[in-house]
Structure formats: structure tokens, C-alpha cells
Amino acid sequence: MPIKSYRPTTPTRRFQTVVSREDITKQTPEKSLVESKKRSGGRNSTGRVTSRFIGGGAKKAYRVVDFKRDKAGIPAVVAAIEYDPNRSSRIALLNYVDGEKRYILQPDGLKVGMKIMSGPNADILIGNALPLKNIPAGTIVHNIELKPGKGGQMARSAGSQAQLVSREGGLALLKLPSGEIRRVAVECMATVGQVGNVDHENVSLGKAGRKRWMGKTPHNRGVSMNPVDHPHGGGEGKTSGGRHPVTPWGQPTRGFKTRNNKRTDKWIVNRKSKKR
């Protein structure tokens, strides 16, 4: 979808861009697939802030998306492409021949009227979901399971894709969007193709208010705080912090590796590539 810009009627309007919604064919969601969504404001059950800079934003209804793709052997027709406020990609409404309706992530190139299917006998076509053992090496996939039957957890955001590099015994080697190469059980399901709405990464919000609509509150720098609030705080006048970047709790940040999960280390062949 093309990026849409606006006439500069205000200073922020000058830089504001949106992804064109010409691909969306249905404005209201399927009622049977909508649930209410409670907002936390970044607080846990005791009322304390556990995720900073979260609050406010437009009210959203949750669309129940099928990440498991476990309806094997039953063909479905794409009935509509819809907007989902809870994720960066579009969602596709499927009408199965047995009458059931489900939402899935819309792969790039999936259009209304196309037929798709899940299961080990499905063809290698965009939108079809198969176990990794039935997908040829080199295929682009998304919505990949980490555990068989749990539902897709990797490569789900707009424009994301992973590549099936090879299979060794009962494990498949995948190159993930981060550059990481990871082993996954060949029984895990994956969907063929790249997630749609590829131009999402090129959008410029243009103004702070648009970030507030998304439920994000202002992010404060540590150097602008007092010493009681942040390790970078204090000093006479403007300072650079005086030390290597750390979090408010003293943990080194900006490139410092904090991963500590020995249980799953054996599944990772190469760590994700560094940002340049």
C-alpha cells in the first residue's frame, strides 16, 4: 500500500504520513470474533507501574486472531481484509466451507476471494499454513510456532518474514527477522509468505498527539531528572550523564546483552545481528 502524505496546513501536518487504507474492504469487525479489552495503564495487580510510559489512548476492541491455524484439511475463502487497531498488520476474515469464521494475519499479496488451507497436505501458496517438515527449504514464512500446538509467536508484525534455511533430523533451521538463526521443531506450524502492510515501517507520526492516541505517554530522559530518580540525573546545567548509559535501576543499556535463559540457549545457533 502506498504512503499517503498531507498538505502542510500546520507544522506537524507537514511531516505526518499514513499508510493508505485502500486495501481494506470491510469497516466493521465480525461481531462473533470481537472481545472486550481491559487496559492496565502499565500497572500490575497491586497498582504499581511495571511498564513505564503507558496510558490513555483510543479505546480498542480485541479481534480474536487464529495464530494456531489448526483447522486442517478444510478450505476457506478470504471474505474481507480488515484494519486491526491491536497490531501493525491487517487481518483477513476467512469463511470456511463448514460455516466457521476466523481471523488470520494478512500475508502480503492475499486478496479477497482467494482460497487458503491449513494442514500437512496444503499447497505451498501464500496464506497456507503447514508444519515446517512439509515446507521446502528457502521458503519465506511467518507466524511461526515455538512449540507444536501453542500458536504462532515469531514473525507476526507488519512486513516481518523468516526464511526456512534447512532441516536437520527433527529440527528446522530458521533465519528470523532480527538475523538470529534458531532451531525449531519440525512439527511446528508456519504460514507461507510475508506479513502484509509492508510500508508500515515508513510511516511518520508527525506529532506527539498521535503517539498519545496509541496509548504511549511521554518518555523522559534520565539526564533531565534529579539524582534521586535516575543514575544520570543531577549536575549543574545540562550534562551528558557522566557515565555509560544505564537504566533507572543501574543496568547497562544500549547494546549491552541482558539475555539470561540457559534453558533455551541450545535452540539458538547464531545470535541476532548487531544494529549498524
UniProtKB/Swiss-Prot annotation:
Family annotation (InterPro entries): NA-bd_OB-fold, Rib_uL2_dom2, Ribosomal_uL2, Ribosomal_uL2_bac/org-type, Ribosomal_uL2_C, Ribosomal_uL2_CS, Ribosomal_uL2_dom3, Ribosomal_uL2_RNA-bd_dom
GO molecular function: rRNA binding; structural constituent of ribosome; transferase activity
Region feature (Disordered): 1-50, 206-276
Record's keyword terms, sorted: Ribonucleoprotein, Ribosomal protein, RNA-binding, rRNA-binding
Sequence intervals crossing the membrane: none
Gene Ontology CC annotation, any one: large ribosomal subunit
Annotated Polar residues bias: 7-19
Gene3D superfamilies xrefs: 2.30.30.30, Nucleic acid-binding proteins (2.40.50.140), Ribosomal protein L2, domain 3 (4.10.950.10)
GO BP: cytoplasmic translation
Biased composition (Basic and acidic residues): 20-38
Subunit structure: Part of the 50S ribosomal subunit. Forms a bridge to the 30S subunit in the 70S ribosome.
Family recorded in the similarity comment: Belongs to the universal ribosomal protein uL2 family.
Biological role: One of the primary rRNA binding proteins. Required for association of the 30S and 50S subunits to form the 70S ribosome, for tRNA binding and peptide bond formation. It has been suggested to have peptidyltransferase activity; this is somewhat controversial. Makes several contacts with the 16S rRNA in the 70S ribosome.
Name of the protein: Large ribosomal subunit protein uL2
Source organism (scientific name): Solibacter usitatus (strain Ellin6076)
Gene: rplB
